[in-house]
Amino acid sequence: YLPQTNQAVNSFQIPKNINDHGGQTRIFMPRYGLINERRHQLHEVIRLSGMNLVVNDVDMPLIIKVASIPKERMQVYFIDNEEYFKRRAVLRDEKDVLFADNDERMIFFTKGVIETVKKLNWSPDVIHLHGWFTSLFPLYLKTYYKDEPIFADCKIVTSVYAKDFEGVFSKDFQKKVAFDEIPDKE
């Protein structure tokens, strides 16, 4: 769905190999504006959409779209929000500058995936995170969602990629995470 990078290839190949050996995987990714919904046959899943997620004291609507990868028996769930993911780029603008709201986009994506997994009533054995954009998952599972039984036995694996993130977040990043009552020490 995105340009070929090591991260994109691994995000597909690892779950494909697990499925090929009898496992059950689901892929979650942001529905970036450069993803062609018609060509990839994305459609909204009404029963999963419709909730608002609070990010930095603002209610943001969560839209869940899904597509299947032909011949692979794999579903991809797209976390969508017009304000965060409509732009026709992934993490940087046309001048190669990181978007100022990437921190809020990370929070929204993290909470969106977790809430969607809860609605699916699917208890994953392993969550495999790819890249810095997913780096808040362990923090949110350990704190904000610590009492969710669906994640009680879940293990987390993280893949970090070279030159995945070069930059700094806004000074307000910690405050935005703290809004979800996540202590500074975490």
Residue ranges: model-predicted function:
Residues Y1-E186:
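Catalytic cores of nucleotide-sugar-dependent glycosyltransferases that transfer UDP/GDP/TDP-activated
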